[in-house]
Regions:
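Alpha/beta catalytic cores of group-transfer enzymes, especially the acyltransferase/condensing modules
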Residues: 10-12, 38-40, 96-246
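FabD-like malonyl-/acyl-CoA
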Residues: 1-137, 265-298
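Long, low-complexity, intrinsically disordered segments
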Residues: 313-321
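Short, flexible loop segments at boundaries between secondary-structure elements
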Residues: 227, 287-310
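Non-catalytic positions within long, well-ordered alpha-helices that form the structural scaffold/packing
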Residues: 73, 178, 259-262
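A short, acidic, amphipathic alpha-helical segment used as a generic capping/interface helix at domain edges
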Residues: 246-263
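Short glycine-rich catalytic loops that host catalytic nucleophiles or stabilize transition states
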Residues: 188-191, 259, 291-293
Length: 321
C-alpha cells in the first residue's frame, strides 16, 4: 500500500484544534518544540479569539500538520508522497525534510504577516460548488474590475472552485453562481486574497528569504501547488513554496498525480476532513481518512493492511479548504 499525506490550508482551522491532536509522544514533542521557538505556548493560539489572526492560524496549521505526520511516521506509517494545500505546503516540505521546522515556522510567520499587511480588510476567499472551472471563470471575468478584482484561485475538484479578491467583487460572483445553479456559494474563513496576482509582493519576499535558507532534496515525492508536478529537488520545492501564494492551486490535479504515482491511501493531517473527502469523492479506487484522535487505531490498522477490521464510513460533504 502506497500512502500520500495531505496537509490542509487556511479555512480548515477551528477553536481548540491543537488541544484535539493525537495523544502521542511525537505530537507533544512537536508542540513543545514550536513553543520553544515562539517563546510562548503554541497551544494558546488556537482559541477563537486568537484564530482571528492570520498569523496564528497559519502557525497552528503548520504545527498540527507536522506533529501528526511525525506521529504517524513514528508508528511506521511512511508516506511516499506529500501534498500540502497553500500554507499546508510548508508542513509538507518539513515532512519531506526539505525545510527544518524552525525555518518553516519563520517563513510561515513572515508569509502571514505580509499577507495581512498588504490586504488587512475588504478581501478574502470564497468557495463555489456545483459549477465547473470554465463556468466560474466566465462569471469571474464578467464581474471583475480594476477597483474590485476577482480571480479564480483554487481548483479543488472538477466542481469545487475557490475564488479570491475583493469582498464586493466576490459577492457579485457568488450571486451569479447561485443563479446559474451552484449548490453552494459562500465565503470562507480566510481574510486575505490568497493564490492570485494581488499577492505577488508576498511571493517575491518569500523568494528572497528562501534564497538564504538551507534546503535539502525531499526524502519523498512532493507534489506542487502551482503546476501539480512531482518535485524531487529542493529548488523546485522552494519555488512552489514561495510562489503558490500568488498563483492558483491545482489541488485536484495534484492529488490525481499522487494517485498516478501509485498512492492508494490518502491520509489527511488535522484539522478537518475536507481534503480526504475530496479524495474519496473524486479519485476512484482510493481510500482516504482524516487522521483525528478517534480514528488513529483505524488508520494504523488499514495502513498496515488489516482491511478486514475496517468499518466503512460514509463520505462527508466537502465545503471549503
Amino acid at each position: 500500500m502506497s500512502i500520500a499525506f495531505l496537509l490542509p490550508g487556511q479555512g480548515s482551522q477551528f477553536p481548540g484544534m491543537l488541544h484535539q491532536l493525537l495523544d502521542h509522544p511525537e505530537v507533544k514533542r512537536t508542540l513543545d518544540e514550536v513553543s520553544s521557538m515562539l517563546h510562548s505556548d503554541v497551544r494558546d493560539i488556537d482559541s477563537e479569539e486568537a484564530l482571528q489572526s492570520t498569523v496564528s492560524v497559519q502557525i497552528a496549521l503548520l504545527t498540527a500538520g507536522v506533529a501528526t505526520a511525525r506521529a504517524l511516521i513514528q508508528e511506521d506509517v511512511e508516506p511516499a508522497v506529500v501534498c500540502g494545500l497553500s500554507v499546508g505546503a510548508f508542513a509538507a516540505a518539513v515532512v519531506a525534510d526539505v525545510l527544518s521546522l524552525k525555518d518553516a515556522l519563520e517563513l510561515v510567520e513572515l508569509r502571514a504577516e505580509r499577507m495581512t499587511k498588504l490586504y488587512p480588510t475588504g478581501y478574502g476567499l470564497s468557495a463555489i460548488v456545483g459549477l465547473t472551472g470554465p463556468q466560474v471563470l466566465k462569471i469571474v471575468q464578467a464581474a471583475t474590475s480594476d477597483r474590485e478584482p476577482v480571480f479564480v484561485a483554487n481548483i479543488n475538484a472538477p466542481r469545487q472552485i475557490v475564488i479570491a479578491g475583493s469582498d464586493t467583487g466576490m459577492d457579485r460572483v457568488l450571486d451569479q453562481a447561485r443563479s446559474q445553479g451552484a449548490t453552494k456559494a459562500e465565503r470562507l474563513h480566510v481574510s486575505v486574497p490568497s493564490h492570485c496576482p494581488l499577492l505577488q509582493p508576498v511571493a517575491d519576499c518569500l523568494q528572497r528569504r528562501l534564497s538564504s535558507v538551507q534546503l535539502r532534496n525531499p526524502k519523498m515525492t512532493y507534489v506542487g501547488n502551482i503546476n501539480a508536478r512531482a518535485m524531487r529537488t529542493a529548488e523546485l520545492v522552494a519555488s512552489d513554496l514561495a510562489n503558490n501564494i500568488a498563483h492558483g492551486v491545482r489541488w485536484h490535479d495534484a492529488t490525481t498525480v499522487a494517485k498516478e504515482l501509485g498512492c492508494n491511501l490518502f491520509l489527511e493531517m488535522p484539522p478537518g476532513h475536507v481534503l480526504s473527502d475530496l479524495a474519496k469523492e473524486n479519485l476512484a479506487g482510493v481510500s482516504a481518512f482524516a487522521v483525528e484522535q478517534d480514528s488513529l487505531p483505524r488508520v494504523l490498522r488499514f495502513a498496515k493492511q488489516d482491511e478486514s477490521r475496517l468499518i466503512p464510513e460514509p463520505p462527508h460533504v466537502a465545503g471549503s479548504t
